[in-house]
From Swiss-Prot:
Record-level GO BP terms: carbohydrate metabolic process; malate metabolic process; NADH metabolic process; NADP metabolic process; nucleotide biosynthetic process; protein homotetramerization; pyruvate metabolic process; regulation of NADP metabolic process
Top-rank taxon: Eukaryota
Residues reported to bind a divalent metal cation: 245-246, 269
Cofactor stoichiometry and binding remark: Divalent metal cations. Prefers magnesium or manganese.
Active site: 102 (proton donor), 173 (proton acceptor)
Reactions listed under catalytic activity: (S)-malate + NADP(+) = pyruvate + CO2 + NADPH; oxaloacetate + H(+) = pyruvate + CO2
Stated name of the protein: NADP-dependent malic enzyme
Subunit-structure text: Homotetramer.
Phosphoserine sites (modified residues): 336
E.C. numbers: 1.1.1.40
A Pfam family: Malic_M
Cofactor entry: Mg(2+); Mn(2+)
Protein purpose: Catalyzes the oxidative decarboxylation of (S)-malate in the presence of NADP(+) and divalent metal ions, and decarboxylation of oxaloacetate.
Length: 572
């Protein structure tokens, strides 16, 4: 089959400025005709490269660098210079590059963001812009925005309050919207809402790029968020997707519950994490050969991630036929004060739902011995929380214990894959939030740890939601997504210890998630894009961003020769 002809794209830009436009720049892939017509001939070396050669050049530079942070800077500079090449590089080996553009390296990048800030990659909206947020949105050069990732920087990964430095998270997240889900990067907008910071180091740092003040809270904060949501929806439409990211626990659930029925919004820390964790559990059940309702699940952590997973597990149990009250009893949570039980002081409304009749306990090892869970899920960002004794006990209670160490970055993981596999003698069904290398057991068997990365979830969800114009994102979408992800795990993957499809298939996974969301949306009459496409897969695929270069030339074409005949005589 012959390759498709490049898409023709017209621009009024010419000369040097065109080579500085990352949406149009092709570096040495410009043809001679393009260079001459666009007035950039002479600005580039007299060499003509294919995109494959350009990728090779980037990879060579990437591999010569000694630290992941330097590799991150290399890729961010490429994103600023040549957008299509940046995404071609990412998609050429997503397993290799994802840990650089997102977790775990993005955590270090956020800590250093004030030091390495180069140029705007998103909007910085501050509390002092109240009453004028609509005007600030007008500063962004793109008129069509279909997806926004927004944070206030208060709980960046497991690193805490990084204030304005948290901008690295929306930027990295939206890069994965495109690399993993095919969203058009020009239709994506990273946003930081700067309301101050409680981080003393940042407040004293002369290089800090954010507001030097304590965080604004209460009604002033809420009014600010209300104005932001209204301004975004007014400018970009009610079906502009707004993803909340890395908000503090105290705000995350509250804001999700406040906005979920008014706007097209979701919280990835709550719902995305829940979906990928439940996907891992569903895949694990194919190894344990039993049902979700046969499990007793213990969480180390009771923040937004833990509660989000717990709520989605309850939904999955209800779908399996278990009444909600019985489903809740299958789930136990441990927070910083110990086991969450009825009558314990200072329980939030969300935690109260999962409080059971039991004596108070504080020590995690003792709690594991008491509850005897079949599945242990860590989401508290306490590195090493799953001690050797806990792992031994899990293996003693269960033939195939399910152990998920989901905290990010790697330094916050509850245990490593090697510790888990070796202490349980390879019987554990393990997944982690950050990537771990394969582990070879004494018997020669090599196990590949499953990475429960939210990137399996949010790109496909965003692609599906945007494609059919959904105006609300329900929890059922995330349960459906979990089921789709689990279905993509083959028996061979399970034998290798993988609970998730290989990352290099993530675009295909996103396509299947989006296709299912689109099918359900039209069936449930919640889609707003009409007429309804007959072939849903082809429809979604047509929405996906191509990393192939466009042909940037004027639209030239021929007329019939007889029409073009030059008149040489005046008719008498």
């Amino acid at each position: 089959m012959e390759p498709e002809a490049p898409r023709r794209r017209h621009t009024h830009q010419r000369g040097y400025l065109l080579t500085r436009n990352p949406h149009l720049n092709k570096d040495l892939a410009f043809t001679l005709e393009e260079r001459q017509q666009l007035n950039i001939h002479g600005l580039l070396p007299p060499s003509f490269n294919s995109q494959e050669i350009q990728v090779l050049r980037v990879v060579k530079n990437f591999e010569h660098l000694n630290s992941d942070f330097d590799r991150y800077l290399l890729l961010m500079d490429l994103q600023d210079r040549n957008e299509k090449l940046f995404y071609r590089v990412l998609t050429s080996d997503i397993e290799k590059f994802m840990p650089i553009v997102y977790t775990p390296t993005v955590g270090l990048a956020c800590q250093q963001y004030s030091l390495v800030f180069r140029k705007p990659r998103g909007l910085f909206i501050t509390i002092h812009d109240r009453g004028h947020i609509a005007s600030v949105l007008n500063a962004w050069p793109e008129d069509v925005i279909k997806a926004i990732v927004v944070t206030d920087g208060e709980r960046i990964l497991g690193l805490g309050d990084l204030g304005c430095n948290g901008m690295g998270i929306p930027v990295g997240k939206l890069a994965l919207y495109t690399a993993c889900g095919g969203m058009n990067p020009q239709e994506c907008l990273p946003v930081i809402l700067d309301v101050g910071t409680e981080n003393e180091e940042l407040l004293k740092d002369p290089l800090y790029i954010g507001l030097r003040q304590r965080r604004v809270r209460g009604s002033e904060y809420d009014d600010f968020l209300d104005e932001f949501m209204e301004a975004v929806s007014s400018k970009y439409g009610m079906n502009c997707l707004i993803q909340f990211e890395d908000f503090a626990n105290v705000n995350a659930f509250r804001l999700l519950n406040k906005y979920r029925n008014q706007y097209c919004t979701f919280n990835d820390d709550i719902q995305g994490t829940a979906s990928v964790a439940v996907a891992g559990l569903l895949a694990a059940l194919r190894i344990t050969k039993n049902k979700l309702s046969d499990q007793t699940i213990l969480f180390q952590g009771a923040g937004e991630a833990a509660l989000g997973i717990a709520h989605l597990i309850v939904m999955a149990l209800e779908k399996e036929g278990l009444p909600k009250e019985k489903a809740i009893k299958k789930i136990w949570l441990v927070d910083s004060k110990g086991l969450i039980v009825k009558g314990r002081a200072s329980l939030t409304q969300e935690k109260e739902k999962f409080a059971h009749e039991h004596e108070e306990m504080k020590n995690l090892e003792a709690i594991v011995q008491e509850i005897k869970p079949t599945a242990l899920i860590g989401v508290a960002a306490i590195g090493g929380a799953f001690s050797e004794q806990i792992l031994k006990d899990m293996a003693a209670f269960n033939e195939r214990p399910i152990i998920f160490a989901l905290s990010n970055p790697t330094s916050k993981a509850e245990c490593s894959a090697e510790q888990c596999y070796k202490i349980t003698k390879g019987r554990a069904i393990f997944a982690s939030g950050s990537p771990f290398d394969p582990v070879t057991l004494p018997n020669g068997q090599t196990l590949y740890p499953g990475q429960g990365n939210n990137s399996y979830v949010f790109p496909g969800v965003a692609l599906g939601v945007v494609a059919c114009g959904l105006r609300q994102i329900t929890d059922n979408i995330f349960l459906t997504t979990a089921e789709v992800i689990a279905q993509q795990v083959s028996d061979k993957h399970l034998e290798e210890g993988r609970l998730y499809p290989p990352l290099n298939t993530i675009r295909d996974v996103s396509l299947k998630i989006a296709e299912k969301i689109v099918k359900d949306a039209y069936q449930e009459k919640t889609a707003t894009v009409y007429p309804e496409p007959q072939n849903k897969e082809a429809f979604v695929r047509s929405q996906m961003y191509s990393t192939d270069y466009d042909q940037i030339l004027p639209d030239c074409y021929s007329w019939p020769e007889e029409v073009q005949k030059i008149q040489t005589k005046v008719d008498q």
